[in-house]
Every structure is written in C-alpha cells, then in structure tokens.
C-alpha cells in the first residue's frame, strides 16, 4: 500500500504516537484490521462527531449486529478507504486495491470499491426501479451491470453507514431524515429485516 502519510487526509490532531492501538469498539480478532486503518490515518481523519476510524468501526458493528456475512462486514469497515460520494479525501488511491484485498479479502475489497465508487446522484434514484441493475461508477464514469448479491450488500452498507451517522449526530439526523426515509423505502426489498427495523427506530 502507499505510504499513509502521503494518502491520508489528517484531521486537526495530526501528531500522534506511532504505536497503533486497538479501538475498544473492535473485538480482539480484528486487531490487525484496526492497526491497518490507523496506519492509513483513519484515526486522524476528521468525521461526523469524531474520527473516520470511529465511524468505520461502528458501521461494521451494525452490519455484524444485523447478521451480515463477514465480507460485507469487512467491506463496511473499509467502505470509505477510497473515499465516497459523501466524503472528500481518501485513505488510499485506487492503485492500492490489491493491498487492501490482501488485508480484508477480495470479496470484501470489491464491495468496498463498489461503495466508494458509487455516483450517488445518478445511482441512488435508480434503486427500486428496473434501472437499479445498472451501476454508475464515479471513478471511471462508466455504467455496468451489478449482481443481485452486490446490490443487496451495497444497500445494506448504505443503511449501516447512514444510520451510524444519524445515531451519532442529531443535526445530521434532522437534516437528512426525509431523504433517508425515501431512500430506505426504495431499498426495502433489498435490505435485511434487521436493517429495516433499525432504520425505522432511528428515523421514526
């Protein structure tokens, strides 16, 4: 992978101890993944109500709580590694995809790429319509077919990402409540019952 110092977008606390520390949010089995995120600078990347590291860990925990397969959960942990349609900056460039795959596995990396590559303005409105099977890639500008399994994983990750932010920030929740309700309603047939119930509980 590229040098984290060259790829990370540090937050206000750029100076830190170089010794990686495991977040209490992660179970011990994921210590290696937590340390890798810190090497990439996720703990210095400012995000809603804290750091990107905190958000990534919490997103993964939601996906696990809802009973998702491990590749989907690991993709949730790394869903912003290449940046997203909602986050400026990235932890690594696309030339590091093989390195990310070595850490979380090829299936999880492919899902993390899919999430980061989504052109939200063009693809989100397609969800719930026949056009949902054609993905729009913001990195390449291309459109291509998406499998049902990949679309379901993408939607589940989307709900987890947005709900984690909504739970962490009252202002975010109030600002985006209506649009998220509409988006999740279109995803209803693609997400788990647990994700649907969590959305209803958080957004009302």
Feature roles, as predicted:
Residues 2-204:
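Metal-dependent phosphohydrolase cores
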């Amino acid at each position: 992978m590229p040098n984290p110092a060259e790829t990370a977008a540090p937050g206000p606390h750029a100076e830190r101890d170089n010794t990686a520390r495991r977040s209490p949010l992660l179970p011990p089995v994921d210590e290696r993944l937590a340390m890798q995120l810190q090497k990439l600078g996720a703990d210095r990347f400012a995000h809603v109500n804290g750091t990107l590291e905190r958000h990534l860990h919490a997103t993964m925990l939601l996906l696990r709580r809802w009973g998702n397969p491990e590749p989907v959960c690991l993709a949730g942990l790394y869903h912003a590694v290449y940046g997203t349609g909602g986050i400026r900056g990235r932890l690594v460039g696309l030339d590091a995809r093989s390195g990310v795959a070595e850490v979380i596995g090829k299936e999880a990396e492919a899902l993390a790429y899919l999430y980061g590559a989504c052109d939200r303005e063009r693809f989100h409105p397609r969800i719930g319509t026949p056009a949902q099977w054609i993905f729009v890639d913001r990195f390449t500008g291309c459109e291509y077919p998406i499998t049902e399994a990949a679309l379901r994983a993408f939607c589940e990750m989307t709900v987890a990402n947005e709900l984690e932010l909504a739970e962490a920030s009252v202002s975010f929740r109030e600002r985006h409540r209506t649009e998220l309700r509409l988006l999740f309603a279109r995803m209803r047939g693609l997400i788990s019952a647990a994700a649907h119930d969590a959305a209803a509980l958080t957004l009302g």
